[in-house]
Amino acid sequence: LAFSLVTGVGTANAATPSTAKASVTETAKASVTKEQAPPRGRTAATANPLYRTGTLPDLRCTTGQIRAGSAASYKIFMTRVNRCLNLMWKTQFRKAKLPFAQPKLRFVTSRVSSPCGRWPSGAGGYYCSSNRTMYIGVTRAVLKNPYGPNHAQFMAHEYAHHVQQLAGIMNYYGQSVWRARSSTKLAFSRRLELQADCLGSAFLRQVADDLPVDQEQWDAMVRWVDENGHKSWPTNDHGKGRSQAYWMERGFNAASPSACNTWTASSRSVA
């Protein structure tokens, strides 16, 4: 069963992110423990081991800058962000004693299909769980905006769907929507997407000094999402703007997966 999970918004050479900050190297050297299979069923979503792993590592992530109109600089930037995500989530999965594997990253200039089907309407990119690949669109519209934190947040959201796949959350989601009525399907989709917003924002907090993004810039990003985040998703499968903003704030403030359990949250907070 394959699902294409989307968010709105060639391989480039990239420098390996530095792990100079102590928390990353110390965690990486932690005692090796036997991995366990990801949980199954509702527990995978509501009580996942990732929720008990504490804050994400304080990672130095050197990305460089995006030049307006430059596809090459955009690919380099996004590839470096992806490498930082790989390192950060590998550390977190080790703490959860869960197996980890990196996703594939594919840059495309047209709306290609995948094993999950056609490119979803309104999406600037998407993650396909069937082949564990992130498809990132490189278009003129994207390249007009050189503001790195926006693109890093987008990448981190798509990567969060891969995290959900590895952690067993995606499997629970797939089984649930397969049996659900239309309105219930949308509710499940919102919980999945809003969790990805939260996890992506937790990552952004831990690399904010390097991107950089200060509190004023972050607040501006959240306000924009609050006012506009729902406009690409008329069926409300990603949540209202205020819901997206709420979960982004939770992730950024806590920098921990524990803040991102949308599966036990009230219906009002995932509307």
Question: What feature does the model see in each segment?
Answer:
Residues 1-7:
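Bacterial N-terminal signal peptides
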Residues 8-71, 183:
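N-terminal low-complexity, Pro/Thr-rich disordered segments
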Residues 45-47, 51, 228-271:
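Pan-zinc metallopeptidase signature
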Residues 76-131, 190:
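Auxiliary, metal-adjacent structural segments of Zn-dependent hydrolase domains
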Residues 115-149, 165:
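Active-site scaffold of zinc-dependent metalloenzymes
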Residues 147-163:
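Short alpha-helix carrying the canonical HExxH Zn2+-binding catalytic motif
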Residues 159-175:
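Catalytic Zn2+-binding segment of zinc metalloproteases
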Residues 182-209:
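Post-HExxH zinc-binding segment in Zn-dependent metallohydrolases
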